[in-house]
């Protein structure tokens, strides 16, 4: 039986031009081209950081995993929103005779808002899939973050006052209505790293970053809002974008530009540990998570229904949701309700369940 590993990431513009960024942004918006001013802002951000190294770094990560596991698996790479696209790579895998595929998403935490976006492309009459849903608890990855933060504390912070700010990509608050485990995983991940450092709960905090302006409420506090709300600041802030593993725009701009600029304004020293990128500890984590999961059941995939229906809100999530009595209904869902000719539109399972919960599911 021919087996493969499919490593997947978000993607990035194929060229840093206005239209190159527009094409990428349009893919993110599911085929709806954003307004020109939105494209211009994102383009300017890419120019500010000198482009993005994400694809180069990811190809190196893939090659390093292949060097470790290539004798047993064919290793492939695909993006969610740029070339090579997941369906195209699956087509190549079929042509190569692959029968089983381990899907390794290069995001350590599970959120149906993000990871389910990969799962929905996993369709094949030939290949059975096994999706590794999360791998943030891998010891090698925890050690990476603890070691790199410890270096900053020892070599740069020394005896001065500091605060570690763990940040993670925000998700829409409606995700919590359906038991998305992402927030709990981020909190646990941060706690595990802090425990390795031997620090107290007062020496770190959790924030969120990189939310999109699509007309819906997102999980708070946003990292920039958190900084602005502080009445007093320590001598040092150590920013740890823990939901990411590679340098890309949401680290190089959202952290290294926006957070850095605010630190300059407040007279605080800005620090950020290097991203794992191609570090051997990250590769150890990726290889080990394959080993831990490789004997699980492979299946012909109906990912949205199966994954979504497994989710149950945690107590932490219920506490957050207690502040809002009603389901947060995004504008794009409202438009979907009003859309004419929707019988020709395949409704995503997530949206169907949201409408069902709100009592607004269109009649068949």
From Swiss-Prot:
GO cellular component annotations of the record: cytoplasm
Catalytic activity: Fe-coproporphyrin III + 2 H(+) = coproporphyrin III + Fe(2+)
Keyword Acetylation: no
GO MF terms held by the record: ferrochelatase activity; metal ion binding
Keyword Ribosomal protein applies: no
Top-rank lineage group of the source organism: Bacteria
Coiled-coil segments on the chain, per record: none
Enzyme Commission number(s) of this protein: 4.99.1.9
Pathway, per record: Porphyrin-containing compound metabolism; protoheme biosynthesis
Segments passing through the bilayer: none
Binding-site residues, Fe(2+): 169, 250
CDD domains in alphabetical order: Ferrochelatase_C
Subcellular location: Cytoplasm
A biological process from GO: heme biosynthetic process
UniProt similarity note: Belongs to the ferrochelatase family.
Protein role: Involved in coproporphyrin-dependent heme b biosynthesis. Catalyzes the insertion of ferrous iron into coproporphyrin III to form Fe-coproporphyrin III.
Name of the protein described by the UniProt record: Coproporphyrin III ferrochelatase
Upper taxonomic lineage: Bacteria, Bacillati, Bacillota, Bacilli, Lactobacillales
Gene: cpfC
